[in-house]
Structures are given as C-alpha cells and as structure tokens.
Amino acid sequence: MTGYIPTLEQIDELHRKIAPSEAAYELVHTHCVIVATIGCQIVRRQNALFTRRCTLSKDAPERGSNRRTENTVDAAVSATPMPPTVGVTGGQVPPRLLDEHLVLIGGLLHDIGTYRVFKHDGSDGEPLKFSKKRYILHGLKGYEYLLDEGVDESIAQFARNHTGVGLTCEDV
C-alpha cells in the first residue's frame, strides 16, 4: 500500500475539492451515495448467505448449482429461499465474506472523475451537461485524480475499473 484509505470525511473533501460547482457536487456525490448504499445492501445479503451457508438446504436456490437438469430446476423452484436481507433477495453464496467497508468507499468514489467531463459544469448557473465525447474518460480521470491526491491504488481502481477500462479478459 502506497497511499491512504480515505475516511468518509476525507471522501467528502475529495468530492468538494474537485467539484466545479455546488450543483455538480450535489449531482455526482448524491449518485455516488446511492450506488454505495445499494452496493452495501448487496454485500450484506451476500455475507448473510455466506454466514448461513451451512444451514441452507441442499436445494436452496442461493447455493447456485451449475448443473441444471429437469430435477434440479424443479427442486430450485420448490426450495425455500433464504428470507430477504435488508430488502434484498436472491444471490448466490460467495466463496468468502465480502468487505462491506471497501464497497462503501469504492461506491462513494467510483464516479469522482465525472467532475472533469462536464461540458457545462453549473458554475455559471447554466444547467449541468456532460460532454458525450469525453464521458468515457471519467473513470481514468477519477483514477488519476485519486492517485494525485495520495489515495491508495486499491481504492483508486474503483474509479478506473467501473467503466471496464483497465480490466483484462482474464479479469472478466
């Protein structure tokens, strides 16, 4: 690790530092909060499945059997699924517990580069508008910004990789 893992307060400071206007901050930061919230709900569900993996019935749909025969499809339909976790249903048992805090930080920072691809950034009172041509660059712009600010690569990669940039065929 060569950089720092930002706290929630530092994440807000990173957003405010790069935001060209209050309107831009409100749009991008609110979106990031929504994504982080949904991500954390999914992780809680996955971790609940992992924690309860020993008590799930063998035919529970959350076990995610890769073999699909007529009998297993019938069994999966008739099996009792695990009750919802924080309003989330479905999913499959992950191979290990997932890091909810990492998902929270990644979700809050994943779109931080969008501040650098506005065509109209709201600073002059005009409505916000993204540059369609440059929008694909927002992941790389966010990655570079976070690294320049001293954020660790393990966190900065959330900005870079959520658009697919930086992923190899093997990663996918």
Model-identified regions with their sequence ranges:
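Acidic, low-complexity proline/glycine-rich segments
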Residues: 1-7
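Active-site flanking loop/helix segments enriched in acidic
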Residues: 7-31, 50-54, 67, 117-130
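Amphipathic alpha-helical segments within well-ordered protein domains
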Residues: 15-16, 40, 44, 140-147
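Short amphipathic alpha-helical interaction patches enriched in hydrophobic/aromatic residues
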Residues: 18-22, 43, 163
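Alpha-helical phosphate/pyrophosphate-handling elements in metalloenzyme active cores
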Residues: 24-105, 148-151, 156
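Divalent metal-dependent catalytic cores for phosphoryl transfer on phosphate-bearing substrates
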Residues: 96-172
